[in-house]
Amino acid sequence: MYKKLFTKKFISFVMSLLLVLTAAFSSMPFHNVYAADNASVVANIVGDFQDQLGDSNWNIDSNITIMQYVGNGLYEFTTPTQLKAGSYQYKVALNHSWNGGGVPSQGNLTLNLTNDSYVTFWFDYNTQSVTDSTKYTPISNDKLPRLVGTIQSAIGAGKDWDPGTSTAIMIDDNFDNVYSYTAHIPKGDYQYKVTLGNTWAENYGANGVQDGSNIQLSVANDADITFFYDANTHNIWTNYSPTLTGLDNNIYYDDLKHDTHDPFFRNPFGAIKVGQTVTLRIQAKNHDLESARISYWDDINKTRTELPMTRIGESPDGNYEYWEIKLSFDHPTRIWYYFILKDGTKTAYYGDNDDQLGGLGKATDTVNKDFELTVYDKNFDTNDWMKGAVMYQIFPDRFYNGDTSNDHAKTLSRGNDPIEFHNDWNDLPDNPNNAGTPGYTGDGIWSNDFFGGDLKGIDDKLDYLKGLGVSVIYLNPIFESPSNHKYDTADYTKIDEMFGTTQDFEKLMSDAHAKGINIILDGVFNHTSDDSIYFNRYGKYPDLGAYQDWKDGNQSLSPYGDWYTINSDGTYECWWGYDSLPVIKSLNGSEYNVTSWANFIINDKNAISKYWLNPDENLNDGADGWRLDVENEVAHDFWTHFRDAINTVKPEAPMIAENWGDASLDLLGDSFNSVMNYQFRNDIIDFLIGQSFDDGNGQHNPIDAAKLDQRLMSIYERYPLPAFYSTMNLLGSHDTMSILTVFGYNSADPNENSDAAKRLAEQKLKLATILQMGYPGMADIYYGDEAGVSGGKDPDDRRTFPWGNEDTALQDFFKNVSSIRNNNQVLKTGDLETLYAQNDVYAIGRRIINGKDAFGNSYPDSAAIVAINRSNSDQQITIDTTKFLRDGVAFKDLINGDKSYTINGGQITINIPAMSGVMLISDDGQDLTAPQVPSNVVATSGNGKVDLSWSQSDGATGYNIYRSSVEGGLYEKIASNVTGTTFEDTNVTNGLKYVYAISAVDELGNESEMSIDTVAYPAYPIGWVGNLTQVVDNHVISVSNPTEDIYAEVWADGLTNSTGQGPNMIAQLGYKYVGGTVNDSVYGSVYNSVYGVDDSDFTWVNAQYVGDIGNNDQYKASLHLINRSMGYLMRFSDNQGQSWTTTDTLSFYVVPSDDLIKPTAPILNQPGVESSRVSLTWSPSTDNVGIYNYEIYRSDGGTFNKIATVSNEVYNYVDTSVINGTTYSYKVVAADPSFNRTESNVVTIKPDVVPIKVTFNVTVPDYTPNSVNLAGTFPNATW
C-alpha cells in the first residue's frame, strides 16, 4: 500500500473541522448527497409504546415522537425515557398522515425488549428503510468508512491516499451494515482501499483483509459506480460491470453462478420423475461467453453426453447473461453434470462446490466436481404410515424380559462357546476389549452374553411405546442365531428360541397392529453364520451344510453348497474378514444368479422375504417391511427382485437400506423406499457437539447453522420426495455410540458421569430431538435414548433398558415433542423451507397451505416453525416470512408454555431460550388458502407500454404484477393489489424484452403462485424501409471481389428522428440464389452447390449503422458471393427480431471468373470413436490457382449443414457439438479463390464412451498372499 504523509498541523485542522461539523448531528452517519433534500417531510415514530412517553398509542399527530431530520433523507428519534420490557409494534407516519399506509406500507415492525431500555429509531426517506437500536448498531461517526486511494482526486474527494481529506464517506442507508458511496468515475485505472475513520489505523484492502493489498479498478468508460463495504465481513466491492463486446479469451469466474437450491437456476428443486423436465441455467457476465454446454454422466446407462445450451437473455440490470437447457430422462438414473464455458481460447468449467453438497457451485480451470440430479420412477411412493412416523428401534435381548422360561433355551453360542447369561439386568454388556483390566468379570468371548429380552417383553411394553408416541417399531434381527446381535443368521425360518416362538411373533405383530403400530424386521442376506444349518462349520446341525460337505470332499452334495465359495485350503469369503460370517456367493455379479438362494429368499411361494410378512395367511400377524443389512454389498438386481416379491404380499412395504452415505441410487423406485439416514445423524451431531470428536464411526467437526442447512438441503435435494419423507432419521443405532455419550455423558465412566455432563448432554439431545421431530422423515428413537441410557462403542451401545430407573423428566420431554409431531399433520407431510440458518440458530418452516400437503393430499391449512438455539444465551431472531406465509398468521410455541407469536410486516420475531428450541404451530382455523392462480394472462406490446390482461381468479381481491427480463425468475414486483384484471406498464424501454407473471391475493393477504409467464417487446412502430442499393449486374465471383456496400434506410417515428443510431434497432442483409440466369449451366458444373445442402432460403448477415439521412437511419453490408445469381433484401426490427419489416427484394447476376478448374477432392479419413467429440482429418486438395479454404459439413440424418470453415493450411477439425450415441455424417469441401468447389467422400461415425485400459501397480509387503483385492466402484469394468 502507498501512503502519503502530511503535516500534523494540517491533520489537526481537518480533525477540528470534522468535530465541529459532527457535533451538530446525531450519532448516525452522513448520507451521500441526493438530488433533493427531504427536510420538509415530517416523520413520526408511532406505535403501542407512545403512552409510556406521555402520549397516546398510535398517535400520528404526536409532537413527542417527531423524528429529528439529520440530513440527506435520514431521520432519528431516541426515546426520552426508558421503555418497559415487553413486545411492541411500530411504524413511521409521514406528515401526520396514514397516506400510503405508513412505512413500511404493509404491516408493522416489532420491537422486543428483554429489559427496560432507551431505544433509538432510524428512518431513511430515500430507501424507505426503518430500524431500531435492538436490531442495529451503526458505526460511530469518527469511524465511518471512506474511500482512500488514487480515486480521490478523480472524484474530487480529497488528496490521493489521504484519509484525513477524504470526503468519499460511505453510509448505511438500508441499515444492514453494508455501507455505500456512489460517484461518477472517469475512464481510467485506479487503486483504492477503505479506512475506518480519517486515519490509517484500521484499513481494509483486497478480499476484505485488514492492511491488505490495494484494490484495483479499471473503468473502461466514464460511469456512475457504487462502492460497498460490509462492516461485518469487511468485504469491499462495487457494482461496476463494464460492457463486454466480442471475444476476449477471458471468462469472469466471479460472475459465474449455478445454484441448485435456487429455482431460477434449477427447476424443479430436487429429484425429478422420469419424463419430467428439469430446467438448468447458468449465469455469466453479460456478453462474456461465446458458448455454454452441459456435460452429464448417466450412472445407470454409463454414458456421458454433452449438449449445447441456449442464451436466453440478460438480467434486468444488464450485468449478467443467462444460458439454459431443458432436460428430461426416460429411465430412472442418477445424473452427474457440470458446465463447459468458452470464450475464444478460454475454457472454464463450472461444477459443484468442494464438499459436493449442491447449492452454489464453483468455477475451475479443469473439470472438478459434478452436480447431482436424481431421476426416479414416476410411480414410486411409500406407505402413508411411513411419512412422518415416530419410529423406535429395539435390540430385543436388551429391551425387556417378558418370558423368563426361554432365558436358558440354549447353552451354546457359536461353535462350542458357552452362553454367558447376565442374572443382573442392570449389568453392563460384556466387552472383551476390557479383558485383563481390574474389575472385568466377563468370559472374553465376543457377542455371547445375553440378558433375556424377548418378543413377549416387547409385546408387554407396547402400551409404553404407544404412550411415547411410537407408530413404527424396527426390530434388530430375531431369527435363530448363535450371537446376541443375530446378524449371523443360523436359520431364517425360525424365531430364535431365546426370543420366543413363531406364535409369540404373530401375537406381537397382531397386538402392535391393534395399537396402530407397524413393525419392521431386520434382514441379513449378504452373509449367514458359519454356525448355521446352511454352512454348518461345527457340525451342530443334522442337515448337510456347505462347509460340512466340503470337508467330506463334495460341497455340491449340500443343498446349500452353491451358496458359498470355499477354497481348497478351507478358507472362504467372509464379511470384512470375520470368519463367523461367510458371504453368499455373487455369481456373474449377482447373488440372485445363485438359483437355490434366490428361490429360498425371493422366488418360492413361502420365500423368506414374503413368509414373515404373512406367516399364517393372516396379514395382520405378519411384519410390515424390512430393514436390509449392508445392502450396498449385495447386487442391486437382487433387491429389485426382492421388491417384486414383497409387493405380492404387502405392496410398497418398507425396504429400508442400511447405507451410511448417499443412497440416491438405491431410491430410484425399483427396490428401496427408505434409508437409515446416518447423514442426518452426523450433521446434527456436528452442529451440536462443539468440539472435534471421533465416535468410532468417524470424525465429527463443529459446523455452524449455515453449513448444517447446506448438508441437510443436500439430502433433501438428492432423494425422491416420497423417500425423503420416509427416511429413517436416527440419532443413534446398534452400530453407533449412544447419542448421550457422543454429547459427553457416560454413566459408566467416572470421567464423564457428572451431573453437569449429564445436564449438558441431555440439553443437546433435546435440541437434536426437537429438530428431528420437526423434520420430514421417520423420527427414529434408539431404545433407551429417551430414558437416559448412555454407552460407548459396540458392544457398550447395547445396554439394557433401565426399567424402574428411567430419567422420567427426559421421557416426558420425548412424549411431549412426539405428541406435538403426531398431533400436527404439518410436521409429518407439510412442505419444508429453511427460514433461518445463522451461527447458533437453525429454523425450518413447514406448511400445509391451499388445503394440500407436500404430496397433494387434502388436510386443513396449517403451518409450523421449528427452531433450535445451541448457544449458551437466549437468542432473538427475526425471520423474513414474505415468501413463507402472509401477515397475521398466529402461532403458539407448544414447548414453551404456549407463548404466542404473530407474523407482522413480513416477519416474525422469535425468542429462543439458551440451549433450547421452539415448536411453533399455527392456531387452528386460520385461512392459508390463496385464490386461484390467474389464467389467460396476455401481454400486448405497444409503443412505450405493455398492456396486461387476465381472467378473474375466484377469491381474489387484488393482484400483484411481477416483471423480469427472462422467463422463470428474477422477478421484481412492480404493482401490488391491483383491483381490476388489466394493467398498463408504462415504465418500459422500447426494444427490450419484458416477462410478466401475475399472482392473486385475497383479503387476508394469502397470495397465489405466479401465473404462467407471458412475454412482451414494446417498440416504436417502423413506418418505412427502403432505398436499397441496386448491385451492378455481371459481378465477377472472387474472394477478393465482394459486392460494393449495399445500403438501406429505416424510419420509425420517435426512434430514428434524433441524431445517432436509434437504440435497439437491428438490421440484416439477406441473400439467396434466385435461379433462371444464363449462367446456371456453368454454375451447375463448376460452382456447384454442395450436395444435400438446402440453400433455398435467405442467408442473413448483420448490417452496420452508417448515419442519419434526414429522419431515417442508414445501414450497410456487403457480400462475398460464392455461387450463382443472387436475390437480396434488407430487414429491420426494433423488438429483438420478434417482427421484421423488409425492403423490396432486388437481384443481380454473378458471373464466373476466368478460372473454371475445380480443385481436386480432399480425402476425408475415417475418424475413431471418441466420447462427445469427432476428430476429422483430411488430405490436402490441389488447384491450378490455389486452395482458398475448406468447409466442413455435417448431417445427423437430414440435410447437410456447414458447421465450420478453416483456412487452406488446416487439414483437421474437432467437432465437440455432438451427442454420444447419435450417428453423424461428415464431408469436407475444398474451395479455390473463384469458389470452384469439390466435395470429399462422406464418413459416418457415432461418438460414444470409449473404455480404456488401466493397469494398477501396487507395492505390497513380502508376506502378502498371491492375490490382492482392489476395492472401489468400477462400473462396467472388464478384468
From Swiss-Prot:
Top-level taxon in the UniProt lineage: Bacteria
Reaction catalysis annotation: Endohydrolysis of (1->4)-alpha-D-glucosidic linkages in polysaccharides containing three or more (1->4)-alpha-linked D-glucose units; Hydrolysis of (1->6)-alpha-D-glucosidic linkages in pullulan, amylopectin and glycogen, and in the alpha- and beta-limit dextrins of amylopectin and glycogen
Binding locations of Ca(2+) 1: D248, N250, D288, D343
InterPro entries: A-amylase_C, FN3_dom, FN3_sf, Glyco_hydro_13_cat_dom, Glyco_hydro_13_lg-like_dom, Glyco_hydro_b, Glycoside_hydrolase_SF, Ig-like_fold
Major enzyme class: hydrolase
Cleavable signal peptide: 1-35
Keyword set, alphabetical order: Calcium, Carbohydrate metabolism, Glycosidase, Hydrolase, Metal-binding, Repeat, Signal
UniProt cross-references to Gene3D superfamilies, sorted A to Z: Glycosidases (3.20.20.80), Golgi alpha-mannosidase II (2.60.40.1180), Immunoglobulins (2.60.40.10)
Active site: D629, E658
Biological process, per Gene Ontology: carbohydrate metabolic process
Cofactor names: Ca(2+)
Residue ranges constituting the Fibronectin type-III domain according to the UniProt record: 930-1022, 1158-1252
Gene Ontology terms, MF aspect: alpha-amylase activity; metal ion binding; pullulanase activity
Binding of substrate, residues: H527, R627, H734, D735, D794, R798
Pfam hit, one: Alpha-amylase
Record family assignment: Belongs to the glycosyl hydrolase 13 family.
PANTHER family with a match to the protein in the record: ALPHA-AMYLASE FAMILY MEMBER, MALTODEXTRIN GLUCOSIDASE
Record protein name field: Amylopullulanase
Species this chain originates from: Thermoanaerobacterium saccharolyticum
